């Protein structure tokens, strides 16, 4: 559909709590497609609506097979397993990286584009990506959670 410019930190929308989606409309469906297109074109593995300037609780995360998972009003319902510290970056904070501690297993729940409630048990890097994108919906960027922040050449 369309590729949007990624909102750059410290834009205020990245610090706002995104609004809940009350109804899945054609506008929300277009938003989901645009998130997927923008994520792929930008070389990301996840993207949240506030990152393209839209204050809605919608995210997309690629699964391990590179298929996009779109979730509306996502929430983490269970964190499990060990915590692991690993490098994270963000399309909204280009050229900056940090070491962030996250749980390596979680259950996330939300709604798909058909309006059905769905849940996913995810592990490893995918679990990290879901936590990162859901943080965006709550006005949190990875810099807030990083124990070390650094720049590196792309």
Swiss-Prot record:
Q: Does the record bear Transport in its keywords?
A: no
Q: Tell me the GO molecular function terms.
A: metal ion binding; peptide deformylase activity
Q: Which SUPFAM superfamilies match?
A: Peptide deformylase
Q: Which CDD domains match?
A: Pep_deformylase (cd00487)
Name-wise, this protein is Peptide deformylase
Q: Does the keyword Protein biosynthesis apply?
A: yes
Q: What class of enzyme is it?
A: hydrolase
- Amino acids binding Fe cation: 90, 132, 136
User: Lineage of this protein's species?
Assistant: Bacteria, Bacillati, Bacillota, Clostridia, Thermoanaerobacterales
Cofactors, names only? Fe(2+)
Keywords in UniProt for this one?
Answer: Hydrolase, Iron, Metal-binding, Protein biosynthesis
Q: Which organism is it from?
A: Desulforudis audaxviator (strain MP104C)
Q: Which residues form the active site?
A: 133
Q: Which domain of life is it from?
A: Bacteria
A Pfam match is Pep_deformylase
What is this protein's function?
Answer: Removes the formyl group from the N-terminal Met of newly synthesized proteins. Requires at least a dipeptide for an efficient rate of reaction. N-terminal L-methionine is a prerequisite for activity but the enzyme has broad specificity at other positions.
